[in-house]
Amino acid sequence: MEKLNQTNLLLRFTLEIAALISLGVYAWISFNGYFKYVLTLVLPIAVMIVWSVFAVPHDPSRSGQTVIAVNGVTRLVIELLIFAMAVAALYFSYLKPVSIVFLCLIILHYIISAERIKWLLNQ
């Protein structure tokens, strides 16, 4: 069970990084001129800040520390919105097959993370 948990944490980390990259790719493909460069950097950084600042206190999948404490449902909604934006970003970047694979990996992660989801919903 511990090995599965470590593998899922690696999958989660990979999905988080891929989500940030996908937002940057979307900005690069979708915008021109000055905005192309600014948004390619700003979008992933803004999402990274939201992801790291809003957390549930004592979350076992994180350090347990937080800057802005939120309840579990709010945290779950933030995660799902970020992943949904990443899937949409890939889709609208003309990477439909990649967006489908990414969505399947996100679903797999949340299926494996059923205990964490239960924990979040009870916070």
From Swiss-Prot:
One Gene Ontology CC term in the entry: plasma membrane
Main subcellular localisation: membrane
Coiled coil (residue ranges): none
Residues annotated as transmembrane: 9-31, 38-56, 67-91, 98-114
Family of the protein in this entry: To E.coli YhgE.
Location(s) in or outside the cell: Cell membrane
Membrane topology: Multi-pass membrane protein
Organism: Bacillus subtilis (strain 168)
Pfam families in UniProt: DUF2568 (PF10823)
Keywords: Cell membrane, Membrane, Transmembrane, Transmembrane helix
Name this protein carries in UniProt: Uncharacterized protein YrdB
Record has Transmembrane as a keyword: yes
Superkingdom of this protein's organism: Bacteria
Gene: yrdB
